[in-house]
């Protein structure tokens, strides 16, 4: 649940909304147990994020949005500022290191998470030269991330995006790929490992990276360790939920990747980018035909 312009409502009122929403959610789940809707069996609490213009990272909750307002996260303006039509900053490997220190808790949650974005309807669409790199560094950034529609397809700022009406351009028509009718096939095996992606190379890249993040909580919340050049192990273990998750992320097309700090020998892994299945030997894996990234997770049946 996203609360717009959160600063204009007193934090205790937001907290009441959170409490009442959780109460209503639990009552609904109790009344619908065993029914057709799988959400009745979920355990997650009502989730709330807030927008406060210009707010940035605040993992210790210095602004009180978590403790006094009940928010789980706040939208992070660090990479796309407050100026209309302004330029954007893009995350990098150094951003991963910085954000892992704030949000890579390894267990549980930070006091106040961030929801990081690079494009906004209020300011500008972030369109650096390499949109694949943007997908890599945003979708694998620790903490929460938000993909504004069309980031994944390099949607253009047009249809009303003149200097006198910039916001119309940031809300331009979606540039759906030519094979959009195949979307059901793209999503068919997202819980295990998808085998079909868009023929649009940029979108396919964002799909692979985003699905890897979807399957692995360690990507956004795991404790990060740099185990080799451009190679990171992220681990998340939470006794309360029973989650025990680890991934290795390698930026580059190298065929041999060190994983020993994250996975034991003889562990079977899958590379979410190339689709290959590999087995750890001598603390390493060898990818037969690596892509632009190596995204390693436990093999899923």
What feature does the model see in each segment?
Residues 5-117, 126-130, 134-141, 153-276, ...:
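Active-site-proximal helices and loops of the catalytic beta/alpha 8
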Residues 121-122:
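Histidine-centered active-site/metal-ligand motif
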Residues 145:
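Substrate-gating cap/lid region and adjacent catalytic-acid/histidine neighborhood
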Residues 148-151:
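Active-site neighborhood of phospho(di)ester-bond hydrolases with catalytic His/Asp-centered motifs
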